[in-house]
Amino acid sequence: MDELVHDLASALEQTSEQSKLGELWEEMALSPRQQRRQLRKRRGRKRRSDFTHLAEHACCFSEASESSLDEATKDCREVAPLTNFSDSDDTVVAKRHPALSAIIRGKQHSWPESDSFTENAPCRPLRRRRKVKRVTSEVAASLQQKLKVSDWSYERGCRFKSAKKQRLSRWKENTPWTSSGHGLCESAENRTFLSQPGRKERMECEAEEQKHGSDENMSECDTSSVCSSSDTGLFTNDEGRQGDDEQSDWFYEGECVPGFTVHNLLPKWAPDHCTEVERMDSGLDKLSDPTFLLPSRPAQRGYHGRLNRLPGAAARCLRKGRRRLPGKEASMSSLGTERIGHTISDPRQTDFWLPSAGKRERNQFNPLSPLYSLDVLADASHRRCSPAHCSARQASVHWGPPCPRDIKRKRKPVASASFSSPSPVHPDVLEPAIPAQKPPDSEWLDGTSAAEKATAFPPATFFKMPQEKNSGCSSSPGTNGC
């Protein structure tokens, strides 16, 4: 028997060495991915105990045969006493395979008690059974006891929940049920004592919770979610959805103007007892609000600020219809405005010099030039700060017969004709033509004052040819000359 054990151990060593050499040879020929797989297989083999491999090689028998069972028991019973009283060769085998010797010495099998050999055989690996974790009845009972809420705590939670619902719904109605000073923050003593409708709701809540017994943990979370929503004074319909806080918080952070809110747009956010007609009425009332969908005051202030920063022409185009000029355009120099006023009122003055002004101030006279027939000229030697020279333009005057039907317009065609007549007329030819074209009712015109005449007929002297300016004026001051 000693020789048999020695031969068996040597054969096992040879087979293990051959298998290792074969695996090394295969790994040399395999790809890196397959080598990783082989390493994983090796790690799995190392986790198993060595005696399983030895027992697999030693006990090569069919599981269903009774003869193999008898042979296995005989071999194990014969090997066990021999290992205790063996020579030095057996000690060498025990040193080489300590797991095998230990399992053979200490393992005591209950062969006659088992129905099948496969359940109690030491050769079977037990790694697959580790994956299956069966819960015993005691563990299940303890878990149920932990999950199950006691009657007192359950009634208390349901009572709190119904009380909060009551307070929130009645706060929505603005009824004097809740005290104005405390609001929603009441003491715990007042929560326990409920009125008759509160008790009815508690009974209904208990009946619903008995139907849905699996949602007991969710009900506790619902009370906390209602508490968090009641802090802001709002009741959101997010029961059973703990992750909806991010979606429901931003609706009531702030409004631009009092208009439509989600509470009125979405019927789910309204109280449960409100009818559809009331919801429709509230929505129509909000639609009739004049401030519906209007920008907020900060937005309006920002718009006006951007409008004021625009240049004059663009701002005027945007303000079309309001006729409101910005303050910057009215900042024309007072001396320039006085000179323009004197030039317009004085019929003898045709050109004048403005004080030194920059380009921005000279550009402010450009809109006035078509209105008063002015040419704004600047000295080219000093472009940055040069005096502006305003001269009156020559315009052709065509005297038409005045309309006898409208007496009020007898003084106005003179000025209008001076701007609209296309044919140029020399002023020397114009002077003798004026007394010849007197209307029949000239007495009315003669009755006017001298100042009125000067203002009524400025184009006759205001628009002069540039050649006449150089030649000078030799006419008497009584005539309409320079």
From Swiss-Prot:
Top-rank taxon: Eukaryota
Residues making up the signal peptide according to the UniProt record: none
Phosphoserine found at: 31, 86, 88
Ranges of compositional bias, category Low complexity: 414-427
Keyword Phosphoprotein: yes
InterPro entries with a match to the protein in the record: Splicing_assoc_domain (IPR051189)
UniProt keyword terms in alphabetical order: Phosphoprotein
Biased composition (Basic and acidic residues): 198-215
Compositionally biased tracts (Polar residues): 468-482
Residues covered by region (Disordered): 195-222, 408-482
Residues modified as Phosphothreonine: 91
Keyword Lipoprotein on entry: no
Disulfide bond residue pairs: none
Protein name (Swiss-Prot/TrEMBL): G patch domain-containing protein 2-like
Gene, per the UniProt record: Gpatch2l
